[in-house]
Structures are given as C-alpha cells and as structure tokens.
C-alpha cells in the first residue's frame, strides 16, 4: 500500500537548518520581514519524522504524507488563530513578531461560513484565505538535513 496526500493546503515551507547555536533563530527573525512569511514556529515533529525515516522505521511515502498532513493541520490552525504563543520571553512568542496584530485579528474573526471541515464554521473562509495568500511557513530544525 502506498500513502499519498493529493490535496495540500500549505504550498510553501521554509526550514532553517543547522547545528545548535549556529544562528538559525536570528536568520528566521530576518526572514519574517519578507512578504507572506509567517512568524517563526518550531515544529518538532519534523525532526521526529526525519529521525524515524533516517533509521528506516517509516517509508518514504509515509514520511512525506505525514509531513504534508501535519503541516496542513498547522497552517489551518495558525490561520484560524489557534495555539498562539503569548509568552513575552519566548522567541516564537507573538510579541517577538513584527506584526502581532495579524494573529490577534485571526483569533477575533467573526465571519462564518457553512461548516465543511470538522464542523468549523470558519473553514471555507480559512481555506480560501490560505489558497489566496499562500503563506510561507517558517521553522527551524537541528541538523535535519544530515538525517534526510
């Protein structure tokens, strides 16, 4: 059996990779200044999947499908205003992003459409926004490329 995810919400993922303390966070904060680049988030599952794939515990098609599926969940949740980090001392926190109001507005959205995605009344609007804006998701990893 081959695992395939034909539909995909997230079309652009940017990963800053390198050894620990090599300046990935600084680079990521610079990259957020570019158009459509979302605030920095750490998606730890990318490292877990990469490690499992490297040690041949999951197949190529399963690894790719899991990454696509999980990143689609992340883009939908972030564009819906979920799981926003408000800790002021955290480098992935909302206050360390140049435009925190974008994320606050997403949380306070009042528009509703017909439920079509797990009963979420904003689903159609969120999916349309993702397809129109094509956000670039930004994350970092620790030596991911060496385990790919």
Describe the role of every protein-language-model region.
Residues 22-37:
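A conserved segment at the C-terminal end of the G1
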Residues 16:
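Hydrophobic anchor at the beta1->P-loop junction of P-loop NTPases
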Residues 140-148:
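ATP-dependent NMP and nucleoside kinases share a basic, alpha-helical "lid"
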Residues 10-13, 135:
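Pre-Walker A (Motif I) flank of P-loop NTPase domains
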Residues 19:
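Short, aromatic/basic-rich helix-turn unit that serves as a nucleic-acid recognition element
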Residues 1-7:
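Pre-Walker A adenine-sensing motif
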Residues 43-141:
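PAPS-dependent sulfation machinery
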């Amino acid at each position: 059996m081959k695992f395939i995810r034909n539909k995909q919400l997230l079309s652009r993922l940017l990963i800053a990779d390198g050894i620990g303390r090599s300046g990935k966070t600084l680079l990521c904060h610079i990259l957020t200044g570019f158009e459509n680049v979302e605030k920095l988030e750490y998606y730890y599952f990318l490292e877990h999947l990469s490690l499992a794939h490297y040690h041949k515990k999951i197949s190529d098609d399963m690894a790719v499908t899991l990454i696509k599926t999980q990143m689609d969940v992340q883009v939908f949740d972030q564009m819906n205003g979920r799981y926003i980090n408000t800790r002021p001392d955290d480098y992935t926190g909302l206050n360390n992003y140049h435009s925190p109001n974008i994320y606050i507005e997403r949380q306070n959205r009042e528009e509703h459409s017909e439920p079509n995605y797990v009963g979420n009344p904003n689903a159609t609007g969120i999916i349309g926004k993702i397809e129109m804006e094509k956000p670039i998701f930004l994350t970092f990893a620790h030596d991911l490329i060496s385990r790919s």
